[in-house]
Each structure stands twice: as C-alpha cells, then as structure tokens.
Amino acid sequence: TITKLVQELVEENIVTDNGKVETPGGRRPNIYGLANSAIYFVGVNVGRDFMGYVVTDLQNNIILEQMDPTFELLDRPQCLDRICTNIEEFVSSCGVDRGKILGLGVCMTGRVNPTTGRSYKYFTSSEESMREIIEERVGIRTLFENDTRARCYAEYSCGKAKDENDMLYLHLG
C-alpha cells in the first residue's frame, strides 16, 4: 500500500513526516516532504586562479565549502585533468554518499555554451565537451555554465535579490 511505501521512505530518511493538517471534516491527512539529507548537490567554480567547491542539501544549506587558491586555469590537457581530479577528490572526501548527489554544477570563467557544455576559450581541441569529460570522469550528472550567469542566478533565486522582481547583476573582476 502507499502508506507502507511512504513509511519505508520515512524510515530510510528520504521522506519526513511533517505532521497532520487541520481539515473541516474527516480524517486529518499527514503532510510529507523530502528530507534535507535525501539529496545533495555539488557546485564547482573554476576561476582563472582558484577553484571553489561546495556541497548543499535540498534547502541550500552549505554542508561543506572549500577553496583551492593554488589552481591556475590554463588551456592545456593537464589542466583539464587536474580539474577532474580535484572534483573527484572533493566528491570523495566531502562526507556525502555519492549516491545521494543528484547533480554537479560547474561554472567557469569566460564564454561558455551551457547547452553543449563547451568553453569557447579553454579546452577547445577536445572532441568531447568539458561537461562530458567531467561527467564521465566523476560519474555524476553535470551542468555547465558561465560563472557570471551562475552567480546572477544564485543571487536571484536564493541570495539578496530573491524577493525582487527585477535586478541588474554586474560582475566586476
């Protein structure tokens, strides 16, 4: 039955029981929701002279955040390999079960094509897109975006501008 399946999901900490709802008549229904610990997301910021990493839960709570100030973005195969290795190491050491990570978002400096997952400046000689290479190496569904666009969207959806109808985002740097 549905009740039994939902109870199993509650016991596995995938779903939370948020209590009953008042109704004008009849049996009061229970409200269920996804548990914060059911799904996680990894974000990676590839800058010119750093890499930043973050793991968040369903409520955008930051579980872990790290910065690598020793990274230098160069248009060489070794650099793409280092990006993949750094992401693999972060995912392996972040303390979250890999099976609970729903997606990996990678934002990168410079012009990028989020649809194809390619940078117009870096790693252009590869037949596979940067997104495809990272996704294959790390084993997690990967989205690829320009860093300014990603920051703007984050500010609009869950930052200081989340309650605004209109906004202008300037990235100076």
Task: Enumerate the predicted regions with their spans.
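Conserved phosphate-binding catalytic cores of ATP/NTP-utilizing and phosphoryl-transfer enzymes
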Residues: 17-39, 144-167
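Gly/Thr-rich phosphate-binding beta-strand-loop-beta motif of the actin/hexokinase/Hsp70
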Residues: 28-65, 168-173
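Glycine-rich phosphate-binding loop and adjoining helix at the ATP-binding site
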Residues: 70-166
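N-terminal helix-turn-helix
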Residues: 1-17
